[in-house]
Amino acid sequence: MTSAWLAFWNGSHSIYVSARHKDVHYRLIAKAMAALVPRPHARVLDYGCGEALHADAVAAAAGELLLCEAAPRVRAGLAARFANDPKIRAVAPEEVERLPDHSLDLVVLHSVAQYLKPEETAALFALFHRLLKSDGLLVVSDVLSPHVGAATDAAALLRFAAANGFFIAAVAGLARTLLSDYWRLRSRLGLTRYSEAAILEKLAAAGFNPQCADKNIGHNQARAAYYARPR
């Protein structure tokens, strides 16, 4: 991840239009992740987890949950928020690299690939292949395809907002976004996008048997999710 994106996520931002938006966003992700946990004693890694407000729901279904976040301020917040949950540990990316081989049952990379260079994503896939057990699962979700633009994302947010009681805040938030640091960064740096064929090829090159999932994790079904198992 470029230093500009890391600084953005480590600072104060308005990517969520309201507290309600942030809450239902993370709740939806946690519910989907919990459903993917294969067994009660599973070791799970959420890589690039953000604030993960409802990570306790995932941990309740697992034996251990590692929350990996590169932004130091966010990582400190995670450690404080879940300090009393013995199943949850906030870790830095370099700590993940030191984990034992074949020690994880589930790895989730949600809404991260668009902020990484292709070679960074390839390196992560190789790392996850090393860390996953032979029957483990990698989930790469919220992947942007080349044809999904900002208008599609905005429409998905408005539908999500209307269904969850923050529509007016979403309209105002979208207007603010056009003047925000996020939009300036997105316009300057762009977002990394993958066709289905491209992401499947990248996963296969890292040693996985990948497939496109029927449904994306999160509210935006114009984006895609992929399941991959080590071969």
Stretch-by-stretch model annotation:
Residues 122-134:
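A short glycine-rich, Lys/Arg-flanked "PGG" loop and its adjoining helix->strand segment in the class I
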Residues 108:
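A conserved beta-strand element that flanks and buttresses the S-adenosyl-L-methionine
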Residues 111-112:
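Short catalytic micro-motifs in class I SAM-dependent methyltransferases
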Residues 117-118:
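Helix-capping/helix-break motifs at membrane-protein junctions
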Residues 1-37, 51-86, 92-98, 139-231:
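Class I (Rossmann-like) S-adenosyl-L-methionine-dependent methyltransferase catalytic domain
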Residues 42, 63, 105:
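Conserved acidic residues
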Residues 41-50:
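Conserved class I S-adenosyl-L-methionine
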